[in-house]
Amino acid sequence: MPVTKTVKMLVAEAKEQTNSISPADAHDRQHSGDAILIDIRDIRELQRDGRIEGAFHAPRGMLEFWADPDSPYHKEIFATESELVLFCASSWRSALAAKTLQDMGFSNIRDMDGGFTAWKTASLPITKDD
């Protein structure tokens, strides 16, 4: 069966329908208390590449379940009025995730442009597991 909509097309649509934020602005908003950073990367990526201090890890496969207040897996961090800034390695998965949370009714969602890779390129602080 031929693919009629590629992942690039899905990501492009998601990016058109969601708000984004630069890594520098995400850093500033996190440190001013106006935003919570949500890291949706796989745990192996965090272990290999490091993490953003203070970011909440919500694996992409659990995101909807953790965000839904009616789910038995709900995490209270998603019941906030603060802005939630999602990121992955390059902002493809996080764009799709931001679109999904918007579809669920969240209005306080942003996708971090370029993801963790752009954060590191901007020389913003990261921590590494020992």
Q: Model regions: which residues?
A:
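Rhodanese-like catalytic fold shared by cysteine-dependent sulfurtransferases
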Residues: 1-35, 43-83, 92-130
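Active-site flanking residues adjacent to catalytic metal/cofactor-binding acidic residues
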Residues: 38
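Short, surface-exposed ligand- or partner-binding patches at beta-edge/loop junctions that are enriched
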Residues: 87
